């Protein structure tokens, strides 16, 4: 089972709000997930990012692959370094 850390979309039309979740790569975007590790609100000024660092590091250590967007959010929050290739 390939596990990914990715965004799950919530919110109304044109007003997205995302939860950062750990899910099986075969699950649909808004489908089943294993664990919720934070949220991302791009509409807020400045954008609101809240991540449980302990959970994120735990999932990265067991081999979960972050999506490109989640990887950039992790870099902003300092969870993974800019030179780290996940």
From Swiss-Prot:
GO CC annotation: cytoplasm; small ribosomal subunit
Q: Name one Pfam family in it.
A: Ribosomal_S16
The record's PROSITE patterns line, in alphabetical order, gives: RIBOSOMAL_S16 (PS00732)
User: What one GO molecular function would you report for this record?
Assistant: structural constituent of ribosome
Keywords in alphabetical order, please: Ribonucleoprotein, Ribosomal protein
The domain of life for this entry's organism is: Bacteria
Query: Its Gene Ontology biological processes?
Result: translation
> What family is it from?
Belongs to the bacterial ribosomal protein bS16 family.
Protein's name in the database: Small ribosomal subunit protein bS16
Q: Which organism is it from?
A: Thermoanaerobacter pseudethanolicus (strain ATCC 33223 / 39E) (Clostridium thermohydrosulfuricum)
């Amino acid at each position: 089972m390939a596990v990914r850390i990715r965004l799950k979309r919530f919110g109304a039309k044109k007003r997205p709000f995302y939860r950062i979740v750990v899910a099986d790569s075969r699950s649909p975007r808004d489908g089943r997930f294993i664990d919720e590790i934070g949220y991302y609100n791009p509409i807020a000024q400045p954008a609101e990012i809240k991540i449980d660092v302990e959970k994120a590091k735990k999932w990265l250590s067991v081999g979960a692959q972050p999506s490109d967007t989640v990887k950039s959010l992790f870099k902003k929050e300092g969870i993974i370094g800019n030179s780290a290739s996940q």
